[in-house]
């Protein structure tokens, strides 16, 4: 699982083959997931494991599950709606027909990379179309994102816009904003389409204005309990990784420094005693104080796997970008 991805990230940073061997030992336990067409997170799961494994090692054994899973994921796309369906379930009291969540942007890296690897333009087209449709429908005028947009599968019409895991439908759920920043930064990096860079910069500008002084967002920017509410370390880690990338991609010199400075601030705070657990504590996770879904009372103020993953990813990117190692000084 993602625990093995951590080992691969540590290998990438240190060059210690022990960690590479530990990661490879268990990666193929995820092999059956390649056919799991009922889960929109398939791209996220396979890119973080098999995708990273191939990127780092170049070994051919990782290619088949990458291609198969990408094509299975593309099967969740509808040309009528122009997006990949997220959830197959309907919650009590909700009348969703074709729900799409902002988190789904994180699956596009797997699709686009597979399209490049295998010369499969259909996969790239699905990724681009999903990103374009989401850009049109998920965002408010202030560049904050809804969590969920529900479409009519018959004609593609937007039926409703909600924020299921946030404070209210019109609130800015922190991790949703992180997925949005990361997703459009990533799509520009892969495709070179300027509209994605513009969107990423607009989202980044909104975040720079609204983030607390230490860089760690409250679980929802519009919670009515600020400043006494919970922070979300996972959102900060995702943002930090995206901010590092965006600092290298932007054409605006004045913004480059602002993005990198925010990433460094977030990483320093996450690496402080307030968020970084001591060895052997916190269930052996790195980061404390993430929030899964406050409205569902699920994963409240706990460690989360993807918080650790993006924290390590952000540290690696920061190290490459600045040729330094972050510390607490």
Positions of predicted regions on the chain:
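Short, small-residue-biased leader/transition segments that mark boundaries at the very start
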Residues: 1-6
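Carbohydrate-binding/catalytic loop surfaces
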Residues: 10, 44-59, 85-103, 143-172, ...
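Structural helix-adjacent loops and short alpha-helical linkers that scaffold large soluble proteins
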Residues: 10-24, 54-67, 115-128, 188-201, ...
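Long, well-ordered core segments of solenoidal/helical folds
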Residues: 18-37, 66-85, 126-144, 152-163, ...
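CBM-like carbohydrate-recognition segments
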Residues: 61-64, 228-241, 246-247, 253-329
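Aromatic- and glycine-enriched pocket-lining scaffold segments that form the walls
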Residues: 83-146
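Oxyanion-binding "anion nests"
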Residues: 176-212
């Amino acid at each position: 699982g993602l625990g093995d991805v951590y080992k691969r990230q540590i290998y990438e940073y240190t060059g210690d083959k022990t960690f590479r061997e530990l990661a490879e030992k268990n990666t193929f336990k995820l092999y059956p997931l390649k056919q799991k067409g009922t889960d929109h997170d398939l791209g996220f799961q396979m890119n973080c494991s098999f995708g990273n494994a191939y990127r780092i090692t170049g070994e051919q054994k990782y290619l088949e599950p990458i291609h198969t899973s990408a094509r299975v994921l593309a099967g969740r796309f509808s040309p009528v709606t122009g997006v990949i369906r997220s959830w197959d379930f309907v919650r009590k009291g909700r009348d969703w027909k074709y729900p799409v969540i902002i988190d789904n942007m994180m699956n596009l890296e797997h699709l686009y990379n597979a399209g490049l690897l295998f010369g499969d333009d259909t996969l790239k087209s699905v990724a681009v179309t999903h990103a374009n449709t989401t850009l049109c429908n998920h965002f408010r005028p202030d560049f904050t994102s809804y969590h969920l947009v529900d479409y009519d599968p018959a004609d593609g019409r937007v039926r409703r816009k909600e924020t299921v895991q946030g404070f209210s439908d019109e609130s800015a759920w922190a991790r949703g904003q992180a997925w949005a920043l990361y997703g459009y930064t990533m799509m520009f990096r892969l495709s070179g389409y300027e509209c994605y860079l513009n969107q990423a910069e607009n989202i980044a500008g909104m975040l720079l204005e609204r983030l607390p002084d230490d860089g760690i967002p409250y679980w929802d920017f519009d919670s009515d309990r600020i400043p006494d509410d919970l922070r979300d370390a996972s959102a900060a880690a995702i943002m930090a990784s995206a901010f590092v990338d965006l600092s290298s991609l932007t054409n605006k010199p004045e913004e480059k420094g602002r993005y990198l400075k925010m990433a460094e601030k977030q990483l320093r705070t996450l690496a402080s005693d307030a968020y970084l657990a001591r060895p052997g504590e916190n269930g052996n996770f790195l980061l404390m104080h993430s929030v899964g879904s406050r409205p569902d009372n699920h994963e409240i103020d706990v460690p989360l796997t993807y918080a650790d993953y993006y924290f390590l990813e952000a540290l690696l990117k920061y190290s490459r970008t600045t040729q330094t190692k972050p510390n607490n000084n």
